[in-house]
Swiss-Prot record:
Subcellular location field: Host cytoplasm; Host nucleus
Functional summary from the UniProt entry: Plays a role in the transport of the budded virion (BV) to the host nucleus and for occlusion of viral progeny.
Source species of the chain: Autographa californica nuclear polyhedrosis virus (AcMNPV)
Signal peptide: none
UniProt-recorded name of the protein: Protein AC109
Gene: ORF109
GO biological process: nuclear capsid assembly; transport of viral material towards nucleus
Keywords attached to this entry: Host cytoplasm, Host nucleus
This protein's GO CC annotations: host cell; host cell cytoplasm; host cell nucleus
Pfam families the UniProt entry points to: AcMNPV_Ac109
Highest taxon of source: Viruses
Length: 390
């Protein structure tokens, strides 16, 4: 994907609010200042947070919701030479540019902005928020009471609830609460799109950086959807790192991974305490990386939620498991090591692995693992099925 060189992207956690002071009139090809301003915002509600009085250098200010024009290729955007154009947190491709430099201010480094001329500004040291759990019925009743108020103003939570509901689509209207209060219930409208949810969560997490104490919050969404939103935010963080940002020390809880750990505890008899994950990793660290083997127990854990048929052709457990090594370029699968982002199997008819699939070689490798690794039994070795590292 390409991006026109006239677009200048600024990424900052401070851009949950619009940076009025960073908007300047641009010059046309004749070096004349263009004093007509067009600001594109991501949602209709965001139009309320653009203060036209804070643009004294412009004769006219227009604020529009940014919508994707499918008839225009973002690689060749429409040129509006009669206006200075600014984008705030765009969620769709940019299809219009103005005179001079078109500036983009965003808290999210999206796929559409990644290939643009990008600058990461204002490295923050946030106070990491803490997510907790809460009964679903109480959350739904509190969110329903809030969302009935069309203006998004704060309403008292139910008597039995100690949560403070927040309308996530309009976080700036809750800025004082998000900074001074705590125990937040993050509510979304049913019709809110995924991209707006991602942007809303990012804005709220950015606002949490201005707190003196870590924020505590719970999200009124299905666990699968929360995991998906967190994954998208983690990918955005990766894009930032690729552009030179600093790593974040804040982490989020992935429900699927947490369920996996709980199942491992039950299967292996690991006690539930602060070092559970550490002990789980140590238990298999001496076999996974040195010998490139995937423990059978990990394969079983990944089959707990699989619908395995009793039919002979479907009774085989799901074995396409990859264990990724941190800060390394390889992954370990049930059939050997493979470069990350490469297929499990080499192209057909390019590798004859008969030398590795015979009983003699398998017994030799098994004996080496048992002897060198200090194991007494219980080791199952399968031959490699590709030749990336042979």
């Amino acid at each position: 994907m390409e991006c026109p060189f006239q677009i200048q992207v600024c990424i900052s956690d401070r851009f949950f609010a619009f940076p009025h002071n960073l908007v300047e009139p641009q010059s046309d090809v004749g070096n004349k200042l263009i004093e007509n301003l067009i600001v594109y915002v991501p949602t209709d509600d965001d139009r309320l947070y653009i203060d036209k009085k804070q643009f004294p250098k412009f004769n006219s200010v227009l604020v529009y919701r940014h919508e994707h024009d499918v008839n225009i290729d973002s690689r060749s955007p429409k040129k509006t030479a009669s206006a200075t154009i600014v984008y705030w947190n765009p969620l769709v491709p940019i299809t219009e540019i103005g005179a001079g430099e078109t500036r983009v201010f965003s808290v999210l480094l999206t796929n559409n902005l990644f290939y643009c001329n990008t600058m990461i500004v204002h490295h923050e040291n946030p106070k990491c928020p803490i997510e907790f759990t809460y009964p679903e019925t109480d959350m739904q009743s509190a969110c329903s009471a809030l969302l009935k108020n069309r203006n998004g103003q704060s309403v008292p939570p139910p008597i039995k609830s100690n949560l403070r509901p927040i309308a996530c689509e309009i976080p700036l209207s809750h800025f004082k609460e998000l900074v001074e209060s705590n125990d937040f219930l993050l509510c979304f409208n049913l019709e809110t799109s995924t991209m707006v949810k991602i942007l809303s969560l990012k804005r709220i997490f950015c606002i949490f950086q201005y707190r003196k104490q870590p924020a505590r919050y719970v999200i009124n969404l299905p666990h699968e959807e929360i995991d998906n939103l967190y994954n998208k935010l983690n990918w955005e963080r990766t894009r930032r790192l690729m552009k030179g940002d600093v790593p974040s020390n804040c982490a989020t809880v992935n429900r699927s991974s947490l369920k996996y750990i709980k199942q491992a505890q039950s299967l292996l008899g690991i006690p539930d305490y602060s070092q559970t994950v550490v002990d789980f990793v140590k238990m298999f660290q001496k076999i996974i990386f040195p010998y490139q083997l995937v423990p059978n127990v990990i394969i079983k854990l990944n089959n707990f939620d699989q619908m395995v048929s009793s039919a002979p052709n479907k009774a085989e457990p799901y074995k396409k498991i990859r264990l990724f090594c941190k800060n390394d370029s390889i992954a370990i699968s049930s059939s050997g090591i493979v470069p990350i982002n490469m297929p499990d199997f080499s192209p057909p008819n390019t590798f004859d692995y008969s030398d590795y699939a015979n009983r003699t070689n398998i017994n030799f490798v098994t004996q080496r693992v048992l002897t060198d690794g200090g194991f007494s039994s219980g080791i199952t070795v399968t031959p490699v099925k590709y030749n990336y590292y042979l």
